[in-house]
Amino acid sequence: MDDPSIASGFQQGTGRTTGANGTQIQREGLDGLLRQYPIQCIGTSLLVALLTTIIIYYSSSSSFPSATIKKTPPIPEINPLGGIFYPSKTKAAITAYLTNARGLVTDFFRQNPGKLAAQLHTQIGTIIVLASSTAEEIAHDERFHLRKQTAKTFNAHLPGFEVFRDDYNNHLMKNVVTKYFNKQLTKVTGILAHEMDLALGELFTTAKEGQQWTEIPLHATALQIVARLSGRVFLGEDLGRDPEWLRITAGYAGVVTMAFADLSKWPAWLRSTANRFLPRCKASREYMDGVRRKLRPVIAQRRKERRTSSREYREYNDAIEWFELESNGNAYDPEIVQLSLSLAAIHTAGDLLAQTLTEVATHCEIIEPLKEEMRGILAKGGWQKSSLDKMILLDSVIKESQRRKPLATLSMGRIAVTDAKLSDGTVVPKDSTVSIDAGLMWDPSIYAQPDEWDPYRFVRQRKGSLEKQRLAELTTTAPEHLAFGHGMHACPGRFFAANEVKIAMIKILLGYDIKFADGVEPKVMVHGITLDPDRRVRLSIWRREDGHGGF
């Protein structure tokens, strides 16, 4: 996954804001320090020591990234900071980022059309934001490194966040996805359809007597569905359906990004300590311990079988086996790679499924056309990947839902591994965090009425040139649709994620009526460039008597 998301760690979108919580916490930390040591009771030397401590505190604080991030004067600032002598200006800059990052970036590049880069100060540091027009320029540029950016952003050196490390494990994972996993797509459509039936039987409880509609937590259920489907392919029937494994993987996917957000409110030099006691950080470590408890006996047994009798060794067709084969005897962490694989799948596909269901339930008029397309194609071709490929309206609905709310308003997060000169002469300094403005996804010159959800938008685009037809497909990446990233680090698992979401949507819409309760208007929770779903939203479901309509 090109963590535009996980990957960026920061993201934003349209909707209600959550507020500048990080700034509030930093202020409370200082207020507490002053309350603890009343000024009138402090001698001169102690007062000097206290003031020195305050300066160090703020200089190291994530509220003042300019004190820890090397400035690059030739690159303009979107939200200039005030430094330690003008804290109110810095507070205003960070608050502006937390509540309106997308607007800040859009306004800057609109007002400065000749600029390719600008500095955006966030609560955890400075990002050099590159204009959308540079997406092709750096798409295959090896001077910009994906995993180093992810490791830096997500504190990968700390326990609980090991899945984000830039090491052999993650290089191995990408190789497995491209070499083994994507080749399974044509073979697993029917398997996933059956698994979805089992998952819905457990997660979409039937209405109680005298009650027509049942409510379910939308986002949490979407994560559980994707965990179930992914686990079936990654680990086979037994472990992939194990309730404890599903609880661990879905739980980790749900908590780790929030743990990162909690940790980012602390100064970098205190994060190692904070990681020990922050509740969500502790939960991340506990989930990781659970992964090791579940997988170690399985992996040990398989390795023993392979060593003792190659004749009797049963070949497995799952991710555990693929990692063993691809590692070719080199040391790696099998528990970490499995959790990384699950996290990438659940985080990306789970969010996309939840957002697509949100849009469809909000615009119920699209449900019947979708069901008509689904029934017609399945009646002719059955549960084959080719059938999914023919569902053009469903593909458009999912892509449009993703366009409206991707995981981030910046994409293609990278670290510059050397000083890198752009085509306009701008030099991006070594070790800078870089991301691309994904604003073309809401550009009215590209998408008519971009703030509106148009389920037929990409259906119409398929009637254009061959290039427009290609760009209309859900899994195609381009500068005007960066939700899956772009270039050599584009999300390698996007093809599987697309199939998972399509199968889930088919089974849900053919088997259930869905709606939101009267007055419910799902909001997007904005925190900097992070765009999160409203996790409190509940979806109303009603299982129809005709079940899945024969499918």
From Swiss-Prot:
Its cofactor is heme. It comes from Sordaria araneosa (Pleurage araneosa). The gene is sdnQ. Heme binds at residue 491. This is Cytochrome P450 monooxygenase sdnQ. Pfam families: p450. Residues 1-23 are annotated as: Disordered. Its EC number is 1.-.-.-. One of its GO terms (biological process) is antibiotic biosynthetic process. PANTHER family: CYTOCHROME P450 (PTHR46206), CYTOCHROME P450 MONOOXYGENASE AUSG-RELATED (PTHR46206:SF2). It comes from the Eukaryota. GO terms for cellular component: membrane. Pathway: Antibiotic biosynthesis. Gene3D superfamilies: Cytochrome P450. Belongs to the cytochrome P450 family. Residues 8-23 have a biased composition (Polar residues). It is a single-pass membrane protein. Cytochrome P450 monooxygenase; part of the gene cluster that mediates the biosynthesis of sordarin and hypoxysordarin, glycoside antibiotics with a unique tetracyclic diterpene aglycone structure. First, the geranylgeranyl diphosphate synthase sdnC constructs GGDP from farnesyl diphosphate and isopentenyl diphosphate. The diterpene cyclase sdnA then catalyzes the cyclization of GGDP to afford cycloaraneosene. Keywords: Antibiotic biosynthesis, Glycoprotein, Heme, Iron, Membrane, Metal-binding, Monooxygenase, Oxidoreductase, Transmembrane, Transmembrane helix. The chain crosses the membrane at residues 41-57. It is found in: Membrane. Coiled coil: none annotated. GO terms for molecular function: heme binding; iron ion binding; monooxygenase activity; oxidoreductase activity, acting on paired donors, with incorporation or reduction of molecular oxygen. The lineage of its organism: Eukaryota, Fungi, Dikarya, Ascomycota, Pezizomycotina. Glycans are attached at residue 21. Its main location: membrane.
